Amino acid sequence: MRKQLPVICVAAGIVLLAACTNDGGQQQTTVAPQPAVCNGPTVEISGAEPRYEPLNPTANQDYQRDGKSYKIVQDPSRFSQAGLAAIYDAEPGSNLTASGEMFDPMQLTAAHPTLPIPSYARITNLANGRMIVVRINDRGPYGTDRVISLSRAAADRLNTSNNTKVRIDPIIVAPDGSLSGPGMACTTVAKQTYALPPRPDLSGGMGSASSAPAQPQGDVLPVSNSTLKSDDTTGAPVSSSGFLGAPTTLAPGVLESNEPTPAPQPAPVSAPVAAPATAPATATPVSAPAAAAPVSAPVSAPAAAASGRFVVQVGAVSDQTRAQQYQQRLSQQFSVPGRVIQNGAVWRIQLGPFASKAEASALQQRLQTEAQLQSFIASAQ
């Protein structure tokens, strides 16, 4: 029995050592993998629209940097990761990404050390629950405790800072366009076609300024990212600190105005009703102008719309400098005028004004298709 004891101890030690080795290898390739099984309600998220793209042949090779080896993830369906996110805030066109594209902070992109390029992932802000889809098109970050580097647009959508922990769940796109992977668990991705019905915009045209142009606005507004609304109690400045999805969307056909509609309008209406009851020849002409004056006040907003003054609001931030920078970048990118308007503690970023609502709707389409930006039409003040 004494001679067999060392053999048993050695065997047990080998088993323990093998178990430790297996755990270490698993942590290097997969961090907290989660199956793409939904056990709760399904939510719709927006962001970069996933589409099938062949892998970049030069950006998906294992490599070394600063003495550390990086192995490209071969099976994203078994990958999931959580950690701190960095914010890549370089100027547009100042850097070339690993995919060969010029870096653009206005795009919903991200850099990751080992995920395939190009690929897509669902990024979740673990502090507030916000989720968006980003396109992985670059490598990094290196030499830090960060697990992913987000573009400025993606960071603003998630409302992240340099101390925010996020979760990375890859989305796999098949050649037929079907989506799968950990990033699709309890999630559906909003398609751009849902937000861009061209026929309603064309039919709105130059027709009635009060009813016909309002229909495209109703079609566009439902895609505003409801999942980006924070449940915290810090109030409006927090929800508006992100560049996109920050403004509160309006009901279909309603134009935004900084001035509330005067409430005491129904009171003067009773005066013209009483005036015809007396029916003297001189009293009736006097009461008619009195009735016209109160009616003109609530119609003042449609009158402004009829004059052809519309703007497209793309966001609101709490910092004036950032708001002006975004407005200038968008104005340059889309060759349209723009302005920054203060509204309480936030600064609204608006493009325009435009002479017709059809022109504003056309810009909305370009913002969504070319920059994946959500917006709404408001009346120019």
From Swiss-Prot:
Gene Ontology, cellular component aspect: cell outer membrane; plasma membrane
Protein name in UniProt: Endolytic peptidoglycan transglycosylase RlpA
Main subcellular localisation: membrane
Biased composition (Low complexity): 208-218
Endpoints of the signal sequence: 1-19
Catalytic class of the enzyme: lyase
Compartment annotation: Cell membrane
Region of interest called Disordered, as start-end residue ranges on this chain: 196-274
Pfam family, one: SPOR
Taxonomic lineage: Bacteria, Pseudomonadati, Pseudomonadota, Gammaproteobacteria, Enterobacterales
Domain of life where this protein originates: Bacteria
Keyword Cell wall biogenesis/degradation: yes
Organism listed in the record: Salmonella typhimurium (strain LT2 / SGSC1412 / ATCC 700720)
Protein family per UniProt: Belongs to the RlpA family.
Any one GO biological process: cell wall organization
Membrane topology: Lipid-anchor
Lipidation sites (S-diacylglycerol cysteine): 20
EC number: 4.2.2.-
Role: Lytic transglycosylase with a strong preference for naked glycan strands that lack stem peptides.
Domain named SPOR: residues: 304-380
InterPro entries linked to this entry: RlpA (IPR034718), RlpA-like_DPBB (IPR009009), RlpA-like_sf (IPR036908), RplA (IPR012997), SPOR-like_dom (IPR007730), SPOR-like_sf (IPR036680)
Keywords associated with the record: Cell membrane, Cell wall biogenesis/degradation, Lipoprotein, Lyase, Membrane, Palmitate, Signal
Lipidated residues (N-palmitoyl cysteine): 20
GO molecular function: lytic endotransglycosylase activity; peptidoglycan binding
